[in-house]
Amino acid sequence: MIMRKLISLFAIAGLLFSIGCNKSSDATSGGPSTSSGAGGGKKLTIALMPKSKGNAYFISCKNGADKAAKELGVELLFDGPTDPDPAKQNEIVENWITLGVDAIAVACENKEGISTALRKAKAKGVKVITYDADSLPDAREFFVNQATPEGIGYALMDEASRLCGSEGEFAIITASLTAANMIEWQKHIEARRASKYPNMKMVALRPCDDLKDKAQSEATALLSANPNMKLIMAICSPAVPGAAEAVKQAGKTGKVKVIGLGLPNENRRYVKDGVTDSVILWKTEDLGYLTVQAAAALAKGTLKPGDKKVKAGALGEFEIQGDNILLGKPFVFNKDNIDQFDF
C-alpha cells in the first residue's frame, strides 16, 4: 500500500520523497517491518515515532513494536528526528498523513508543538495515539502511559533520599527543558521532596539534548561547581551512563551517587562497578509492543473511547484510566537484579 502511494507520488511530482523506510535497515532506521499478515483484506499501516531515533530507549521500544507488528501482520513504519526536534516531528507527521497510514503513534517532544499536526491527522481519518510523552488530549484518542508521572517522580525522589540519608544536595540532568513528560516528572520530584524530604536540596537542572557525551560534560561541570553535591539524578536514558562516566573519571565513585531512568544494558557495567546505584524504568520493549497493539486495535475499531481495558496479544489485558492505557509501575534495577534483564 505504502509503496504504491510512493510510486504514484514519484510519477506525479517527479520528486524524490524520502521517509524513514528509505534509510538504512538497522535498528534506528525508518524501515517498515516486513512481516506478512494472515488473512486477506487491507493490510494496516502503523507509523511509530520516537523523540529521537538513535536513542537506545526508543530502539528498545521499537524491538517490542516489531514483535507486535509481526504478530498482528501489520506494516510498521518507524521514523523520527535524529535529535529531539518538535519541528521535525511535525514534518514527519505531515508525510505520514500524505502516505495515508492507518494509525500514528508519537512520543511527543513538545505537546503543544505537535498537537496541530496530530489534529490534522485525526481530521483526515488517521487514528492517533501517543506513548511515552503525551500531546494535548484533544489531539489523540489514547495515551499509552508507561507509568504515571507521579509514580515516576516519587520513585526517583524516594530512591535519591534513601541513598543520601534524606539530606544533602542533588542535581538533575534532563534531555531538554521543553520535554513535556520530563517537566511533569520534575514537578512530582519536587512535590515529593518538599513534602517528605525537606532536607534534600536540588542545586541544578541541566539539559543534555538526549546525548551521552553532553550529559557527561554537564555532570563534570556540576561536580566542579557543587563540591557538596551527594547525588546526580539523570531523567533521560543517555544521561545515566554519561553522568556515571563523569563521576568515575572524577574519582568520586561512592562519594557522589548516580541514579536515573535508563536501560539495564546501557548501565550494567556502571551498576556492577558501584558507580551507578540504581536505574529506574519500565520494560521498554513492552511499551513498544503495547503501543502497536493499541494502535492496531484502534484502527480496527476494537478499541474505542470509554473502554476500560485493552487486549495486547501475549502481554494480556491492560487497564485504561480515562484515555490513558497504563503499562504499570516503575521498576528499580540494581546490582542484585540487573543481570536478570537484557534490554
Where are these regions (language model features)?
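Short, intrinsically disordered, low-complexity terminal segments
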Residues: 8-10, 35
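Bacterial N-terminal signal peptides
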Residues: 10-18
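Positively charged n-region of N-terminal signal peptides that target proteins for export
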Residues: 1-6, 65
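A residue-level marker of the well-folded mature domains of exported/periplasmic proteins
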Residues: 21-343
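Short linear sequence motifs
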Residues: 2-3, 10, 50-51
